[in-house]
Each structure stands twice: as C-alpha cells, then as structure tokens.
Design a protein with these regions (language model features):
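Active-site-proximal or metal-binding-adjacent scaffold patches in catalytic folds
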Residues: 1-68, 77-105
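Walker B catalytic acidic pair
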Residues: 73
Length: 105
C-alpha cells in the first residue's frame, strides 16, 4: 500500500461516516496518471469497479490537497453522482462542512 492508497481509504471512511453512500466497489489502489495536465484526478468505472486516478503532479503536493482530490473523486462513485449535479454537490457540501475541504467542480 502506498501513501495515496492509505489516503483513499481515509477519504472513503470519512464519506461513510457522514452517511454518504459511496460504492463498495472502489479499487483500493490509486493509479497515478503521468500524462494528466489539466486535471488533478478522475474516477473511472472499469469492469464493475471504480478506479481513482491522481495526477503525477500531486506526488509532491501537501496531504490536504491529495485528500480533497480523493474525496472529490470518491463522491463520483455514489449512485446518481457520475457528474457534478445537485446530489454530488450536496455530498461535497457535507464533506466540506465536516472536514474543512473546499471540494467543488
């Protein structure tokens, strides 16, 4: 397990503690995307499992920035949250209020 993987587990735990219905099918391994230049992260559904990718640029970032990005992507695994609609925004607001994040679209 690397540092991103441990942070992902924490982000999932935080969301579940707030009653946010994140998927039980999130890969525990965070993929590092070495080509991403316009985004910090993404959530991809592959074969019934969600894979979270983070930009290589976050390897040198502070833990808080990584946590916020992971939390953002974890919310996309919730039913009805593939985009940044009202439900996703509601869950982001819960995470922001509880943990001091600034998750936004």
């Amino acid at each position: 397990m690397n540092e991103f993987d441990a942070l992902l587990a924490r982000a999932v735990e935080q969301a579940r503690a707030l009653g946010i219905p994140v998927s039980a099918r999130i890969s525990p391994r965070v993929a590092v995307n070495r080509r991403a230049v316009t985004r910090f992260g993404c959530c991809i559904r592959r074969g019934g499992e969600y894979v979270i990718e983070l930009s290589e640029r976050l390897l040198e970032a502070e833990e808080r920035a990584c946590m916020q990005t992971l939390a953002h992507e974890v919310l996309h695994t919730c039913p009805g949250c593939r985009n940044h609609g009202a439900l996703w925004k509601e869950y982001a607001a819960r995470m922001n209020g509880a943990y001091g994040y600034a998750i936004s679209r």
